[in-house]
């Protein structure tokens, strides 16, 4: 299989790390997933920082921040664990080291999250910055992702979940 991408006015052949079935599309992660700031708000709410989300500290409240809703996905973009994704357990303000992870509604969310998890170590080990390492957004945005039909996305995500349960 050969894959091509338009870069400016030129069509360029892209070398990919995997072979994909003919009925799959191949896109860049930035085409189906974006890192956004979230909605700025005022008023007391819980601070959803990494320690709290990992269960290593109790809840604190803050007066303002970037609001996220229960069920949203947020990704660490600063610090040693850049690239780690959390599902927000309750409404609140995301910690300052996070971005809201917007996922295209045409995709099966667990499939995209499994894809990002697959690259977690690579994202963690390719951070930018010396004092405070940051997520390598160029790497994140440009990861090629195979897009199977929707039912296949569901089947793959369910199988990954089943197998990961065996590893626990």
Label every PLM stretch briefly.
Residues 9-40, 49-53, 150-158, 163-168:
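Non-catalytic DNA-recognition/assembly elements of restriction-modification systems
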Residues 18-29, 85, 103-110, 133, ...:
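Catalytic cores of nucleotide-enabled group-transfer and carboxylate-activating enzymes in metabolic
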